[in-house]
Regions:
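A conserved glycine-rich beta-strand in the N-terminal activation segment of trypsin-fold
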Residues: 27-51, 65-70, 92, 119, ...
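Terminal peptide-recognition signature
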Residues: 39, 46, 50, 81-83, ...
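Envelope-exposed proteins and targeting segments
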Residues: 35-37, 44, 59, 65-67, ...
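Catalytic-histidine neighborhood of serine endopeptidases
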Residues: 43-90, 159-162
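C-terminal cap/linker of serine protease catalytic domains
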Residues: 4-36, 87-93, 153-213
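Flexible, gly/ser-rich surface segments that form the specificity/activation loops bordering the active-site cleft
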Residues: 86-145, 156-171
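Soluble non-cytosolic domains of exported or imported proteins
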Residues: 2-10, 101, 137-141, 148, ...
Length: 213
């Protein structure tokens, strides 16, 4: 009996790779089952624009205080997503008229519930370096509205996790800015008339909740 078991044990032992290489090691870390971010209300019909990566692989997408949202369109090149909620009242679409490309901007979003209680929006400052935002805002600001010092729409915030070895969330995110004209072009291409008049970003952002399997 020992002679038949021993080769099997040896074969299994030699097949074990404690530190995998290649595609097995290079795969992205698993996404959170529930992830929170921010969306910008862009039209009174319930249209909301956000970061496409935030809602990637979601089984259900919900807008806090309003209910479930439909995924209407995506732009994988710019990582933008268009959502829509129905029957919502009291929406305040943001004025998306662009600013003059200031290097210091305000990011208005709704932080992850682990960082704050409630759905209140908050604003943090960041500097624009090319397409990068420094420093990166807190988790939950993916999809946040970026406004320049004149109160003009500067673009949409994206958070991209750094893929390195180590515990989940051990490293800070990288933040990027999708410029205002790219956001407007995306909406126009999807027949959304962005005629918002609100200049108060805090009144025009909503919490986006993504639920994955």
């Amino acid at each position: 009996m020992e002679n038949t078991v021993e080769p099997v044990v040896i074969a299994m032992s030699s097949a074990f790779t404690p530190f995998p290489t290649g595609p097995q090691a290079a795969g992205p870390p698993p996404r959170k089952t529930v992830e929170y971010g921010t969306g910008i209300v862009v039209a009174e019909d319930g249209s909301i624009v956000t970061d496409r990566q935030l809602i990637d692989a979601c089984v259900t997408i919900a807008i806090a205080g309003f209910g479930n949202a439909d995924r209407i369109a995506e732009d994988r090149e710019r990582d933008l997503a268009l959502l829509r909620i129905y029957g919502a009242r009291g929406l305040k679409p943001l004025n998306l008229a662009g600013g003059s490309g200031k290097t210091t901007i305000d990011l208005t979003g709704i932080a992850d519930p682990q960082s704050q209680g409630g759905n209140a929006a908050s604003t943090v400052k960041a500097s624009v370096n090319g397409s990068d935002l420094v420093p990166a805002p807190a988790v939950g600001f993916s999809g946040a509205a970026a406004m320049d010092s004149d109160g003009k729409f500067a673009g949409l915030t994206q958070l991209k996790p750094v893929l390195v070895a180590g515990p989940t969330n051990a490293t800070p995110s990288q933040a990027a800015l999708v410029p205002a004209d790219a956001v407007r072009d995306f909406l126009k291409a999807n027949a959304v008339t962005a005629s918002g008049t609100s200049t108060d970003a805090k009144a025009s952002v909503v919490r986006v909740i993504c639920v994955r399997k």
